[in-house]
Swiss-Prot record:
GO process terms (BP): dTMP biosynthetic process; dTTP biosynthetic process; methylation
Protein's name according to its UniProt entry: Thymidylate synthase
PROSITE patterns given in the database record: THYMIDYLATE_SYNTHASE
Binding site for (6R)-5,10-methylene-5,6,7,8-tetrahydrofolate: 51, 169, 263
Family: Belongs to the thymidylate synthase family. Bacterial-type ThyA subfamily.
GO molecular function: thymidylate synthase activity
GO CC, alphabetical: cytosol
Organism whose genome encodes this protein: Bartonella quintana (strain Toulouse) (Rochalimaea quintana)
Binding partners and assembly: Homodimer.
Superkingdom assignment: Bacteria
Record has Methyltransferase as a keyword: yes
Length: 264
């Protein structure tokens, strides 16, 4: 996936070295955009193997409106464990904001359900938006949303999605985010009777942690393979009815995983 490797190279060669909240230190650029045509293939990195199971289960977890790691752990996914409290709670993070955004009048807004209705009724709307960034609740979240705002666009019977990500850990996090939102776009397109269009990924602070530099250089030495395809069970017409078994990745030829520490 040359588009992603170009990002790695750009940050390594053009980025500014800065301090950060974790104390590790980063090299970063401010403002970067990638575009992936979902008709060409599923944008899952081939220059290192990714754990697709975690990506799919995390997305289904978000769509459930869940904010406790118990369900993830039941399915062998531990990517949120570092931030959970002793009871497994993470506070009002992504799933809560997507499905139960608290309004000032006491209502709870299901942004995802509202989005699905709007795509069908007013596909030309410029308000096909979901936000996870709720300033009133940031302090209650175990980790404020990094991928915080996304918008859909319908044209020529295709559904495209643009994500704004304020904070982008480009070695560990961004490959997951690309695959997750590409898959979400495909799922919403299917249940809306549309084809998947483009996924556009806009990054704010795009950074490499200083203890990921060598891994990034090693990954840049690898040559990408052809993209895989994602087969989604065509019988599913309700977004909230998808199960892990409804997804099948075809022709994924990835090079070995590259280990790197997580900055908490």
């Amino acid at each position: 996936m040359k588009t992603y490797l170009d990002l790695l190279s750009h940050v390594l060669n053009k980025g500014i070295d800065r301090t950060d909240r974790t104390g590790v230190g980063t090299r970063s650029v401010f403002g970067y955009q990638m575009r992936f045509d979902l008709q060409i293939g599923f944008p899952l990195l081939t220059t290192k193997k990714l754990h697709l199971r975690s990506i799919i289960y995390e997305l289904l977890w978000f769509l459930r409106g869940d904010t406790n790691v118990a369900w993830l752990k039941e399915h062998g996914v531990s990517i949120w464990d570092e931030w959970a409290d002793e009871k497994g709670n993470l506070g009002p993070i992504y799933g809560y904001q997507w499905r139960s955004w608290p309004a000032s009048d006491g209502r709870y807004i299901d942004q995802i359900s509202r989005l699905l209705t709007m795509i069908k009724k007013t596909p030309d709307s410029r308000r096909l938006i979901v936000s996870a960034w709720n300033p009133a609740l940031i302090e209650e979240m175990a980790l404020p949303p990094c991928h915080c705002f996304f918008q859909f666009y319908v044209a020529d019977d295709k559904l495209s999605c643009q994500l704004y990500q304020r904070s982008a850990d480009i070695f560990l996090g961004v490959p997951f985010n690309i695959a997750s939102y590409a898959l979400l776009t495909m799922m919403i397109a299917q249940v809306s009777g549309l084809k998947a269009g483009d996924f556009i990924h806009t990054l704010g602070d795009a950074h490499l942690y200083s203890n990921h530099f060598e891994q990034a250089r090693y990954q840049l030495s690898r040559i990408p393979n052809a993209l895989p395809s994602m087969l989604i069970n065509p019988s599913v017409t309700d977004l909230f009815s998808f199960k892990f078994e409804d997804f099948e990745l075809l022709n994924y030829e990835a090079q070995p995983h590259i280990k790197a520490p997580v900055a908490v």
